[in-house]
């Protein structure tokens, strides 16, 4: 949420007066990517919302719980959970090392599941609860798998969370949806990802 699509969503919500819990793995600036959770918090508050920047590695269950608890204590509850964190490497099977494979699945699939799970007890108390995942349609066409099967598997895991949780919590009134750009967006994260230059030409 400190840059790119996540920050854009947070700023748009802030225009409507939203309070935003902004979680990122580190407060240090990325050598290739602009912004930190603190600069993002300033931008959110400039739009009219309130921001709580929290350092949180979403692979760490205890830290996720602490971040959620801090947000609830500060703002009184949670109405919307946006799962935007994502690790990306657009490489084929032989070019993808297992450390990167594990990272993509830990952040994209497991992280989305964990953050949603920790937010749900609070969402169930909300009058109009939503979970929004930045993940693609479950399109089984081979063209989405061939060039970067490991990344697609990890992103589809996020989409399966949408499908499953929407069904599981529909009677309790929790709306669970996915948002996915129709075309690739030329963000700094895409540009700097291994294999991202080819995608940039399509955006």
Placement of each model-derived feature along the sequence:
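Conserved catalytic-site loops of classical short-chain dehydrogenases/reductases
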Residues: 79-80, 102, 129-134, 174-177
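Catalytic loop of short-chain dehydrogenase/reductase
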Residues: 124-125, 130-171, 180-185, 195
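A short, exposed helix-loop element centered on a Lys and neighboring polar residues
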Residues: 116-117, 163
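Substrate-binding pocket helix/loop in short-chain dehydrogenase/reductase
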Residues: 92-93, 97-102
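Short-chain dehydrogenase/reductase
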Residues: 1-75, 88-89
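A short helix-coil junction within the Rossmann-fold of NAD(P)-dependent oxidoreductases
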Residues: 16, 74-75, 91-92, 118-127, ...
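Conserved hydrophobic beta-strands of the Rossmann-like cofactor-binding core
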Residues: 67, 81-82
């Amino acid at each position: 949420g400190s840059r790119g699509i996540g920050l854009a969503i947070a700023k748009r919500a802030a225009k409507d007066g939203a309070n935003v819990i902004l979680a990122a793995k580190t407060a240090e600036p990325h050598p290739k990517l602009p912004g930190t959770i603190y600069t993002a918090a300033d931008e959110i508050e400039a739009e009219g919302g309130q921001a709580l920047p929290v350092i949180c590695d979403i692979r760490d269950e205890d830290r996720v719980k602490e971040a959620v608890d801090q947000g609830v204590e500060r703002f009184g509850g949670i109405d919307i959970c946006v799962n935007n964190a994502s690790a990306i490497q657009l490489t084929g099977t032989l070019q993808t090392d297992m450390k990167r494979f594990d990272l993509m699945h830990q952040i994209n699939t497991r992280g989305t599941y964990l953050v949603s799970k920790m937010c749900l007890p609070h969402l169930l108390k909300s009058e109009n609860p939503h979970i929004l995942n930045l993940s693609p349609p479950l399109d089984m066409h081979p063209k989405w798998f061939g060039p970067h099967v490991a990344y697609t598997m990890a992103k589809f895991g996020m989409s399966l969370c949408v499908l499953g949780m929407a069904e599981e919590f529909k009677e309790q009134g929790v709306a669970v949806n996915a948002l996915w750009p129709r075309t690739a967006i030329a963000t700094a994260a895409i540009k700097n990802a291994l294999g991202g230059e080819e995608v940039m030409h399509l955006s």
